[in-house]
Every structure is written in structure tokens, then in C-alpha cells.
């Protein structure tokens, strides 16, 4: 298994509560991330709170595959969202999102750590980095058109 971390941030013209609500409400995520097909709330809760099963599309060259992963929302406060993601085989991602007021909006800062099997790691890590960068842009666009 390998582990590596990265960070991303973006300025959003909105208030902290709105951004936190969008990030923590996974029923909104199909509007934000186009590869998500379905979001289902699990009847089994995680240790900290809500658990979701996400069905999305994995692109590999000209091929598309449906995949599933699980998201546990560990905690939500007025300025943070902490989640853990599990995708088979043995891939784990933790995400601590912090919201800091800045001027006329907020700075959304994500600290992401991924752990995955050695053979999958480089591919999965690069896809994860690209996905999170794209998601930040989409969150920004979604939130700013809602306010």
C-alpha cells in the first residue's frame, strides 16, 4: 500500500454556510460532478454520521465502467467537512475541507490523503487529483449560480 497527500483551494463568492451545505449534502453532487450516476443514502450510518453509496462512471480509454464507492461523512461544523471514501479494491481517501471567510466570499481549502494498493496507486492518485480539481471548479460554479 502507498499513501500520499495533496491540497487544493479555490475562492468562492458566497458565505461559509452555503458552501458547507452544498459540500455536505451528497444529494446535490450529481449536479456538481457529471460522472455521478446515482447517490443513495445508506441505512447503515457511519461512526460520525451519514453514509452514502455513490454510483459513477470510470473512463478508461474509450471504455466506460459503472463503479461504486462509499462516502462516510465523519463530521460537519460551521467551517469544516471531514469525509472518508472507500472504493474497492482497497482504496481509501480522506478529505478535510476547511472554509475560511475572505473578503467578499470564502476560501475553500481541501486536504486530501489517498491510500491504495501499490499496483493501482499512481493511476488512482492522478485520477483523484484531477477529479478533486475539477470538482472544486464545479462547486464554485454551482454555488455562485445559486446565490
What are these model-derived regions, one by one?
Residues 1-2, 27-34, 59-65, 86-90:
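Short, solvent-exposed secondary-structure boundary motifs
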Residues 1-48:
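Hydrophobic ligand-binding cavity/cleft-lining segments
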Residues 3-9, 51-53, 68, 80, ...:
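Intrinsic-disorder/low-complexity, polar/charged segments enriched in Ser/Thr/Lys/Arg/Asp/Glu/Gln
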Residues 84-134:
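Beta-strand/loop substructures that line and gate deep hydrophobic ligand-binding cavities in soluble
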